[in-house]
From Swiss-Prot:
SUPFAM superfamilies: S-adenosyl-L-methionine-dependent methyltransferases
Pathway given in the UniProt record: Amine and polyamine biosynthesis; spermidine biosynthesis; spermidine from putrescine: step 1/1
EC numbers: 2.5.1.16
Protein name stated in the entry: Spermidine synthase 2
InterPro entries from the UniProt entry: PABS, PABS_CS, SAM-dependent_MTases_sf, Spermi_synthase, Spermi_synthase_euk, Spermidine_synt_N, Spermidine_synt_N_sf
Pfam families given in the database record: Spermine_synt_N, Spermine_synth
Ubl conjugation found in the keyword field: no
Positions of modified residues (N-acetylserine): S2
Species assigned in the record: Arabidopsis thaliana (Mouse-ear cress)
Length: 340
């Protein structure tokens, strides 16, 4: 990875709508102050200079803003724009294609829930596959489970891995675990080639269903996941916000109910810096031993001496595990309507 690239707040360009970015072939952009051009786009607000504003057609008519103290890194990989900045209130922030992926302050709520909701729902998981998750946070959490013998991670963008290791060492610490096998490549292709019944659990830590992550929300991908799971194996995938994306969630639930013949459930957690402040997960099991996702059956290894460089859990516990499946009435009505 290239050396640290720093820029002043006022040198950053105004955010374009995401569709415009997809049509752009990496050309230069005009900066806010009109002083020259740089190639890396950002989401700095043109209304309030010095603030990052997350703007996307995925959540029209609204934006979430964070005050920027310093830009730590700007880069463009083969797949997406990557930015790291120091915020005034949430620590360091990782942004991919203009969308916040994690902040030091609240990443625990996402990483812990997407990992422990599935892994604590089955007994003694041994082989785990992570699709995406290049920042390493899911790896950190999987490593808390002493029964796990093999952790494969397939991340398409090596720049994300390198940036996480440099700027988010407490998140990327998972890469230090000897059980981890990193594959830089396309998760869709990797799963197509995976042997049937290989994994006890698959965790899909994807970004929004736009650009390189789009295929991770489509039916053929879920079919590949189901084939790669052992009987009664589980999958947990990022499944958008119930406040913003019920149409997307409805499609995901419908696809999952068609494919996974075990349990199919939707859960959610609170992440302040994600759009609407919440993010959801689809949890499904393959045909075989019944899985009740709402009742955790496995405990997390809390012996910190056996977990290299791990801090204690900050968000997950058994009570919040069960509570995560309690849905507001409007969401429950839509999701239940897709029941077979």
């Amino acid at each position: 990875m290239s050396s640290t690239q720093e820029a002043s707040v006022t040198d950053l360009p105004v955010k374009r709508p995401r569709e415009a970015e997809e049509d752009n072939n990496g050309g230069a952009m005009e900066t806010e102050n009109g002083g020259g051009e740089i190639k890396e786009p950002s989401c700095m607000s043109s209304i309030i200079p010095g603030w990052f504003s997350e703007i996307s057609p995925m959540w029209p008519g609204e934006a979430h803003s964070l005050k920027v103290e310093k830009i730590l890194f700007q880069g463009k990989s083969d797949y997406q724009d990557v930015i790291v900045f120091q915020s005034a209130t949430y620590g360091k922030v990782l942004v991919l294609d203009g969308v916040i992926q994690l902040t030091e302050r609240d990443e625990c709520a996402y990483q812990e829930m997407i990992t422990h909701l599935p892994l604590c729902s089955i007994s003694n998981p041994k082989k785990v596959l992570v699709i995406g998750g290049g920042d390493g946070g899911v790896l950190r959490e999987v490593a808390r489970h002493s029964s796990v013998e093999q952790i494969d991670i397939c991340e398409i963008d090596k720049m994300v891995v390198d940036v996480a290791k440099q700027y988010f060492p407490n998140v990327a610490v998972g890469y230090e675990d000897p059980r981890v096998n990193l594959i830089i490549g396309d998760g869709v292709a990797f799963l197509k080639n995976a042997a049937e019944g290989t994994y006890d659990a698959v965790i899909v830590d994807s970004s929004d269903p736009i650009g390189p992550a789009k295929e991770l929300f489509e039916k053929p991908f879920f079919e590949s996941v189901n084939r790669a799971l052992r009987p009664g194996g589980v999958v947990c995938t990022q499944a958008e916000s119930l406040w913003l994306h019920m149409d997307i969630i409805e499609d995901i639930v419908s696809n999952c109910r068609d494919i996974f013949k075990g349990s199919v459930n939707y859960a959610w957690t609170s992440v302040p810096t994600y759009p609407s402040g919440v993010i959801g997960f689809m949890l499904c099991s393959s045909e075989g031993p019944q899985v009740d996702f709402k009742k955790p059956v496995s405990l997390i290894d809390t012996d910190e001496s056996s977990i290299k460089s791990h801090c204690p859990l900050k968000y997950y516990n058994a009570e919040i595990h069960s509570a995560a499946f309690c849905l507001p009435s409007f969401a429950k009505k839509v999701i239940d309507s897709k029941a077979n």
